Each structure stands twice: as structure tokens, then as C-alpha cells.
Amino acid sequence: MADGEEPEKKRRRIEELLAEKMAVDGGCGDTGDWEGRWNHVKKFLERSGPFTHPDFEPSTESLQFLLDTCKVLVIGAGGLGCELLKNLALSGFRQIHVIDMDTIDVSNLNRQFLFRPKDIGRPKAEVAAEFLNDRVPNCNVVPHFNKIQDFNDTFYRQFHIIVCGLDSIIARRWINGMLISLLNYEDGVLDPSSIVPLIDGGTEGFKGNARVILPGMTACIECTLELYPPQVNFPMCTIASMPRLPEHCIEYVRMLQWPKEQPFGEGVPLDGDDPEHIQWIFQKSLERASQYNIRGVTYRLTQGVVKRIIPAVASTNAVVAAVCATEVFKIATSAYIPLNNYLVFNDVDGLYTYTFEAERKENCPACSQLPQNIQFSPSAKLQEVLDFLTNSASLQMKSPAITATLEGKNRTLYLQSVTSIEERTRPNLSKTLKELGLVDGQELAVADVTTPQTVLFKLHFTS
């Protein structure tokens, strides 16, 4: 897409490509539905109105596409995911897959309405699918009790639209990278049939957002990574010697006392879903809090700090899920112009919404298809490069593995996910880039948990 393309022409082109991708075949089979079941949907698809797409032609084919053909993947079956699944099933979408790696906890029941007390301990995806398949006639929800990383590109390519209700930025970035990897280019021109639209929703307390991402055409997750706040971490000196907040006491026990005392046996890791582990952290945190006259340590707060739980409000989930489901409907039917492309919701004080067009970043590490330029002195140590990859607001990598081609061989400079390799490559962190044999213009390949793709960086030496 040309950089100088006018916004209106750009919007029209996107709409045409979406309509082409969602084009449906004529003909419809017997759905077994009772008369009047889909009247509420037909009002949007079988007649025109002031808000319909200028090129939309009312017909029965769009509804049949939803009922018989359109395949939607919902990632996440938590507070937002339950709302999404319900909205999609009642809007005519019947071919729905859902992925969630979590099991149901008693704390979920107040807002995740597809679950009941008898379901505690069972996989969220499986219970949600069972509930909807039983409650909504002819609905076929297929559950996957897995991580999103467990599936390959063939799996994701089968869906017409993917919608996310995640509480993890890492997972968002990974699925963003996966959908970008599905894109096909012919002579530098994007093949629109390879685009799998991504609808992403997120909530925190009384705030939320929803966005429409057309990989390769509009701003992706990485283009706007700076919008996501970094995870709150407390300085170790404060935690150890000057605690002031109940969170400081909990973090002290989690980070220092647990590995030192190993209360459940040598090498047993802390499990945030194990009540006995949380109870131990809670009691030790109370003891430390009493030493510093700190109040406010509760079992719920302990669980929230250990599991990094994001505050959830049912009404916020309902609003954001409604927006996301509406965008799925608009894209699937091409009946209405989709959101362009980012919506913010806030009802902390009154009600506020705002929509704006997030712009693509020219040098986005995910969707620009360009190597990322980084500048360092030849005397800089590899540790400085590692710090840059993890601390940069536009990269925010978690455990980058750095490799380079030296003397015709692919060499791992540092990899921390495998203990034996980490121990072998750790000395490289204290070496300079020149000592490692890197030269000006050297390409570094970096792998990270935030993306299924390897990110290429071009190293430029500064004088």
C-alpha cells in the first residue's frame, strides 16, 4: 500500500479486500431452525439502512454464511471470553473454536457465567463448549485445552476471523506474529486471501479497549506496543529493607523466602493455583507485615500478587465483548464498515469512549518485513544488547535468544531457556561485540517467547 494513499481511498480498499475475502457461495441448506429464530439478525442483513456499507446488497446469503460456513476462533474463555462466546453463538455463528489453557477456579464464578460450582477444576474451554452446545441449538463449539503455541500455521489458517479475550500481552504478541507469518506476498503485493482478521479486546477494572487488526494492512500489536503498560515490579532494595505496602511483603516472601525455605520440598516451584502454596505465602506475608506495622495483607491480595491477576468487572467485560462481537459480525458479513481501528472505553467517572486510527509503524519488528537497525559501539558488551532487547519500549522481549552467522556457521551467542546452553553461553555476556567477532552490518537473529517468528536486527557500529 502506497504511503501517500489518501485515507478515504485506503479505507475503501480495505473494505473491498474484506468483502472479497468474506465472499460467499450461493445456495443454502436446511439448518433445522424454527421460524423466526434469526429475525433479529435478518434485520441487519436482509434490508439496507443508513449505516449499512455503501456497497452492501441485502440478501439471504450473508446469514447462511454465518450459519453454515464462517469459522471463528475465540482465544480465552475467561471473563471476556465467556461474553464473546455467548454473543457469537446468539448472533448466528455456529462454527466456533475456543482455546484456553486454564482451569476453573471458585473466584471465576462471579462473572464467568458459563461455569458452575460443579465445574471447579475442569478446563474452561471444555466446560464453555459443553454449556453452549447444550444451550444453543445447532451450535458447534470445539474446545482446545491447550496453549496457543501448541498449534501450527495450518490450524490458524482455517479460520475466517480470530477474536481474542486475553489477559496476557505475551500471548497477544504471539498470535499477532503468527497471523503475520500467514501472509503471502506476490511481487511485493499482499494477497488479501491470506489475511486472517484479528479482533482484540482487553479489560482492566472499569477500563477497556477493542481493536480491529488486518495483518499486513493496519497497525498490529507490535506497532502500538508502547500502549501496553509494563508489568509492575518492585525494587529489590525496597522489598528487602524498606517495605511500605502489603504487596512488598508478599513479593518478599514469594521471591526470597520461598526459594530459601522450600516449604513443600526441594525444587518444588510455587504454584499460584495451589491453595496450600498460597496459604503459606499468605501466612508468611502476614508475619512480615506485622514486623513493619503494615496492614492490608489478605488472602485475595496474596493470590492476586502471586498470579498477577488483573482486576475484573463484569460490566466492562460485557461492553468490550459486545464491541468485539459486533466487529466480527461486520467483517464476516461485509454489511457494515468495520471499526477503524481502536476503541477506548472508560467508565471510572461517568462514561467515556473514544475511537482513533492507530497507525502502522514503518519499522515495526513484526509487520514491516524490514530488519531492525540497532546501534552499538564495538566495545559494547553483549549484555548491553540483551538489556536493550528487554527494556526497549518498542520491543519488550522476555527471554531473547541471540544468534549470528560467524565464519559461515550459525552460532548461538546467548540462550537462556535451556539451562545447559545458558551456562555455556553466559560468558559471552561480558564480552564486547568486537571480541565476539561481530562486524558492522552484522545481522543478528533473535528468538523470543513473544513471537513465533525470528526477528532480524542489523547491527551498526558507532564511532
From Swiss-Prot:
Binding of TP53BP2 to the regulatory subunit NAE1 decreases activity. Its EC number is 6.2.1.64. The keyword Ubl conjugation does not apply. ATP binds at residues 100-124, 148-171. The record marks 211 as: Determines specificity for NEDD8. Keywords: Acetylation, ATP-binding, Cell cycle, Ligase, Nucleotide-binding, Ubl conjugation pathway. GO terms for biological process: endomitotic cell cycle; protein neddylation; regulation of cell cycle. It comes from the Eukaryota. It is an enzyme of class 6 (ligase). Arg-211 acts as a selectivity gate, preventing misactivation of ubiquitin by this NEDD8-specific E1 complex. Heterodimer of UBA3 and NAE1. Interacts with NEDD8, UBE2F and UBE2M. Binds ESR1 and ESR2 with bound steroid ligand. Interacts with TBATA. Catalytic subunit of the dimeric UBA3-NAE1 E1 enzyme. E1 activates NEDD8 by first adenylating its C-terminal glycine residue with ATP, thereafter linking this residue to the side chain of the catalytic cysteine, yielding a NEDD8-UBA3 thioester and free AMP. E1 finally transfers NEDD8 to the catalytic cysteine of UBE2M. Down-regulates steroid receptor activity. Necessary for cell cycle progression. PANTHER family: NEDD8-ACTIVATING ENZYME E1 CATALYTIC SUBUNIT, UBIQUITIN-ACTIVATING ENZYME E1. This is NEDD8-activating enzyme E1 catalytic subunit.
